A protein has these predicted regions:
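Alpha-helix C-capping/helix-to-loop hinge sites
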Residues: 9-10, 30, 85
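Short, acidic loop-to-helix structural element flanking the phosphoryl-transfer center
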Residues: 17, 26-54, 95
Length: 170
C-alpha cells in the first residue's frame, strides 16, 4: 500500500500489517471528524449543480475517508464523479487525476471549469490540461507562491466560495 511504502521510505522500518491498519483507521477517523461544510456552501453548490455537473479531484490518499466525508456532508448526491489521488497513484498537478475526472464525466478539458484553492496543484494542473481555472484565495493567497517561467495564471480569482456563484451563474 502507499501508506506502507511511505512509512518504509520515511522511517526506514517495515511495519506490521496490523500497525498499518491501525494507522489507516486512526487517520480515517480523524479526517472524517475534522471535515466540515457550512450549510451556506452546501446550498451554493446545490444551486450551481442545477446548471453545471460537479466533480471532485482530491489529493488525499485515502478514498474511504473522502467517500465517507462526502456522504456525511451531503455532497455525494451532487457530485457526479470523484477522483482521489490515492486511487489514481498520482497527485495534482500531475495530469492523471485530471484525465481521470474528464473520463468519468466524458468531457473535454475546454468544457470544464476547475475550481481550487491551491495555485500549484489546482491551477497549474487544470491549465496544463486546457481547463478554465478559478483560484479561491481564501486559504492560500496567490502572492504566496513563487511562479516561474511557463507557469499559468488562473483565469479568474475569487476571495471565497460565495463569489463563485456570481462568477459562474452570470
Amino acid at each position: 500500500s502507499i501508506t506502507e511504502e511511505l512509512i518504509r521510505e520515511i522511517y526506514n522500518i517495515v511495519p506490521k500489517e496490523s500497525q498499518i491498519n491501525a494507522l489507516i483507521q486512526a487517520r480515517y477517523k480523524s479526517f472524517v471528524n475534522v471535515v466540515k461544510l457550512s450549510s451556506d456552501v452546501l446550498q451554493l453548490l446545490k444551486r450551481v449543480n442545477k446548471r453545471y455537473r460537479l466533480g471532485l479531484v482530491s489529493n488525499y490518499p485515502c478514498s474511504r475517508s473522502i467517500q465517507h466525508s462526502l456522504m456525511k456532508l451531503g455532497l455525494s448526491d451532487i457530485l457526479e464523479a470523484v477522483v482521489i489521488s490515492g486511487d489514481v497513484g498520482y497527485v495534482k498537478p500531475h495530469a492523471k487525476p485530471f484525465k481521470a475526472i474528464l473520463n468519468l464525466l466524458s468531457l473535454r478539458p475546454k468544457e470544464c471549469v476547475y475550481v481550487g484553492d491551491n495555485w500549484l496543484a489546482d491551477v497549474q494542473g487544470a491549465k496544463r490540461m486546457g481547463m478554465y481555472s478559478i483560484l479561491i484565495e481564501q486559504y492560500t493567497p496567490y502572492e504566496s507562491f513563487d511562479p516561474v517561467s511557463g507557469d499559468h495564471n488562473p483565469d479568474a480569482t475569487i476571495k471565497n466560495l460565495n463569489e463563485l456563484e456570481e462568477l459562474l451563474l452570470r
